């Protein structure tokens, strides 16, 4: 996993509450286990009409918001099924940071396991961020737990364990590999059956 230290990007805004994993990536696209190729189906039922034309009223289809890598959204983002495809779709689309009023617990963990930074932020602060010009680069500094725009500076918090994993680009496998010597020593000591 790529280390996450400072991210600069533009933001897309979808301030709906209770966006569930089926809305993030509909079930008909979940027949694969690769982590890539899901971005084109992100928010599929909202982004496209029945003939697969882009819905011009959907925020991610706005020309100013294309290429955004920060998503600012409502409360309880990622609720519903615990499938990991939802974070895969967000990451494959290009999002690195998701700022919400809150997240479903499993979704929150799955974001970090996939190298995305989910940030919990109250509504007042999110509304200030939403007013940022669509073309303005927003800086998210994980090490100092700060989000900076041209007019505001916001602090956020993250559990130390998750922060260290993201800063160092560690997933479960790479963490396990840090204990390779101890594992080999244990296997040498313990009799095989």
Curated annotation (Swiss-Prot):
Keywords noted in UniProt: Amino-acid biosynthesis, Branched-chain amino acid biosynthesis, Leucine biosynthesis, Lyase
Swiss-Prot/TrEMBL GO biological process terms: L-leucine biosynthetic process
GO cellular component: 3-isopropylmalate dehydratase complex
Gene Ontology molecular function: any one: 3-isopropylmalate dehydratase activity
Alphabetical list of InterPro entries matching this protein: 3-IsopropMal_deHydase_ssu (IPR004431), Aconitase/3IPM_dehydase_swvl (IPR015928), AconitaseA/IPMdHydase_ssu_swvl (IPR000573), IPMI_Swivel (IPR033940), LeuD (IPR050075)
Enzyme class, first EC level, given as a word: lyase
A Pfam family annotated for this UniProt entry: Aconitase_C
Enzymatic reactions: (2R,3S)-3-isopropylmalate = (2S)-2-isopropylmalate
UniProt pathway annotation: Amino-acid biosynthesis; L-leucine biosynthesis; L-leucine from 3-methyl-2-oxobutanoate: step 2/4
E.C. designation(s): 4.2.1.33
Family: Belongs to the LeuD family. LeuD type 1 subfamily.
HAMAP family documented for this protein: LeuD_type1
Function recorded in the entry: Catalyzes the isomerization between 2-isopropylmalate and 3-isopropylmalate, via the formation of 2-isopropylmaleate.
NCBIfam families referenced in this protein's UniProt entry, alphabetically: leuD, PRK01641.1
Complexes and interactors: Heterodimer of LeuC and LeuD.
Record-given protein name: 3-isopropylmalate dehydratase small subunit
Source species of the chain: Bacillus cereus (strain AH820)
Gene assigned in the entry: leuD
